[in-house]
Structures are given as structure tokens and as C-alpha cells.
């Protein structure tokens, strides 16, 4: 997904900030919030190799345990009763449907994840759990307090055992955006 066409070419298009709250602008903002990765696939795919981790090792049950959410409105009716929630292939299928809140993936014809990125919605959306815990209707703008960013990053093969220990110590709802820069773990809510 590309930023709205009235963007000034910056990541945020801030130069063209507007008070126009038309339905078209609101819909464009919602699309950016939900689906735009701002190019972070470079980190999540090229550096952290999370596309491989998700494709090979992350089944929906594991994804839900680390706090990822599934948008029930992105699922065909009755699909959850027909799929294996213990299979990473099901996670790939959910990504193809854009049903994993805050995670965008490019999946090729052979069901391999070639690019993986995250959006604002990963941390700043949740679901109402109307289908089951972690699966329901989106609630954009609500914090995902179940999200365990440290446990997710710790799955990466690109980090050391010492880093994994730090990431795994954070727990749900906490994150330290400076850890990779200063090496000091100070996760915040």
C-alpha cells in the first residue's frame, strides 16, 4: 500500500497536514494506520529474518500466545472450524487474507513469505475477542496490552542468546525502543 496520493513524499506527508475530515481522508488514514509498513520490511525480513521464522515455526496458537490479533472481519465464514490452528501454513494463509492485525506479508504463489513488515496497528489496535481470545472485530486506537514484542523479537535467528534473554524478560505490554541503540533494557508500558 502506498501513502495517500496527496503525500508530499515524506513518510508521514506532514507537509500536507489538513483539517479535512472527509470520509475519503478518514478512509485513507485508516488504510495507512492498518496496512502501511513505511518500509520496515527491510528490518523484519532482511535483518531479523522473521519471514522465515513465521513461515516455518509460528502457528496461529503461538501467534495468539505472543499477543498477535486476528481480525474476524477479514476471515471467510466458518474458516476457523476448517483449518489447523497448530500449523504455520494456517498463519501464512491468515497473512494472505490480511487478517493478522498489524502484520503485512507478501506471499508468493508457493505460499512462501517473501516480505514481512509491521504497521501502526500491531501495537495500537486490538480485537474484541468476540470469536475467541485474540480473534474478533478490530478496535483501532486501543492498545494491544497482550502484545509481547520481546518474545516476538526473541524468535529471530539474527540475535544473540544474551539479547534473546533480555527480550524474553520484557513480558506482554512492554517494549524498549532504545535497547538496540544503547544496550540498556528499560521496557516501558
PLM features: what roles do these ranges have?
Residues 1-17:
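Bacterial Sec-dependent N-terminal signal peptides
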